[in-house]
Amino acid sequence: MGLKEDRWITDMALPHNMIEPFCENQVGKNVVSYGLSSYGYDIRVSNEFKIFTNINATVVDPKNFDEANVVDFIGDICIVPPNSFALARTVEYFRIPRDVLAICLGKSTYARCGIIVNVTPFEPEFEGHITIEISNTTPLPAKIYANEGIAQVLFLQGDADCEVSYKDKKGKYQKQEGITLPRILK
């Protein structure tokens, strides 16, 4: 299983629509950088956010998630409260090939400010926007800039196609659009 380089990412993104929209260059002046890098792709966070709140004093339960736990926000700058959490989504829509697994890591620009980004792996044949988990670990409010970089995706190509892909098993987040809250298959 090898890490894929910029030429491969471009070859998969443009003719095969693996990443839409696709930025062929790294954009980094006066913004948190995004676009193609040497061995990855820096994804952007959209302007849609769900910010966790304790106003309704409910319990966060992944098996029975209460939407009262979050407040919807749309804007160019999202302020994540101290020691709090927000969900967002990528600007980019992904179509992962059957022989590829993608792993996402937070950007150092945000990490150095105490903002931790978590995204689970993009499984083979996953398709959709990526829901991004953003944690503000600081005792201060933190700014997240919409339409700028938030994390980097690394693409790992297997030696052969997997037996069962995310699409084959009808993954619960397949073809998700917007920010998708926790789901449990029943």
Swiss-Prot record:
Associated pathway: Pyrimidine metabolism; dUMP biosynthesis; dUMP from dCTP (dUTP route): step 1/2
Pfam families the record matches: DCD
Keyword Nucleotide-binding: yes
Keywords, sorted A to Z: Hydrolase, Nucleotide metabolism, Nucleotide-binding
Active-site residues, as the UniProt record annotates them: E133 (proton donor/acceptor)
Binding site for dCTP: K107, S108, T109, Y110, A111, R112, Q152, Y166, K175, Q176
Catalytically driven reaction(s): dCTP + H2O + H(+) = dUTP + NH4(+)
One GO term of the biological process aspect: dUMP biosynthetic process
Keyword Hydrolase: yes
Catalytic activity, EC: 3.5.4.13
GO molecular function, one term: nucleotide binding
InterPro entries found in the cross-reference section: dCTP_deaminase, dUTPase-like_sf, dUTPase_trimeric
Family of the protein in this entry: Belongs to the dCTP deaminase family.
Chain's role: Catalyzes the deamination of dCTP to dUTP.
Record text on subunit structure and interactions: Homotrimer.
UniProt-recorded name of the protein: dCTP deaminase
Species, as recorded: Wolinella succinogenes (strain ATCC 29543 / DSM 1740 / CCUG 13145 / JCM 31913 / LMG 7466 / NCTC 11488 / FDC 602W) (Vibrio succinogenes)
Gene name per UniProt: dcd
